[in-house]
Amino acid sequence: MSHRILRLPLVIQLTGLSRSTLYLRMANGEFPLSISLGGRSVGWLEDDVDNWLAQKIEDSRKV
């Protein structure tokens, strides 16, 4: 398990989603929740984002 923290610009780049879409999907339980890094800083665990991406790929390949 990786505890590497990804910041918002990298999460946007990896997912292809906008900031507002990421936060909307988080609110709807459709994207991993961010973790507080203190102050106004947040990040996402790399494993959580990787698992979400892998699931999206798997779902898109189902008939």
Give the location of each predicted region.
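Intrinsically disordered, low-complexity and often Lys/Arg-enriched segments
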Residues: M1-S2, R61-V63
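Major-groove DNA-recognition helix of helix-turn-helix-type DNA-binding domains
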Residues: L14-G43, I57
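Polyanion-binding surface elements
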Residues: M1-T21, N51-K56
